[in-house]
Amino acid sequence: DLPYLMPVDNEKQIYEVLDGELGGELLNRIEGTGVNGLGIWYGGYKLFTTNGPEIHSPADFQGLSMRVLPSSVLTAQYENWGAEAVPASYSELYSVLEEGIAHGQENPVQTIALNCYQDVQSQMVQSYHGVMHYVLLANTAWFESLPENMKEAIIEAEEYGRKEARKAYAAQEADYIATLESAEGVHYYELTPEEIEVFKASVQPVYESQTAGSQWQMDYVKRLQEAFAE
């Protein structure tokens, strides 16, 4: 969830890095917790949405309240930009927006469209500030109890499903965007490259606060940044 850790508008590069050694290292960190990480699945770039002013710079968040998942990273992100972070569960999100408990939120375009958040939000901002990912997990004891041929079949099926899901998302994304663009009273727009650079320049305090105390996290984030910069 670290803002602007992932490359802007470049899914192919994200896939290459997370399907490779660095993604495997992250999955290996899950070992010993009772579950195995089988793969990292793409869920789309997150948008900012608000029911207030347009967002073109970090300063535009001043005075806003933004719903977040219970997450120190997301809380630090919005507080760094001068907004109040309002933790709320996914099931509560629509009512939180409808009742004005929070001015806005962040989610991928398909989550916004399928849950009709465009009915209670007026600004939809493609910011490329973050990417939603999901990790497919298997119970370790169950997985290790399987014969080798079944383990191999599951691993192959996960890889196939992960890649097919990416294709399906890409095929549907334009339709979801069209749903938002055509919604009454909704303004959908993308940040300009110049605006994105201003946001990128603002987030270093978030990185420092969220990786402090963990040499592995600091090193891993640095290696991800280097890989995405290639």
Walk through the language-model features, giving the residues of each.
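N-terminal secretory/targeting leader peptides
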Residues: D1-Q13, L22, I30-E230
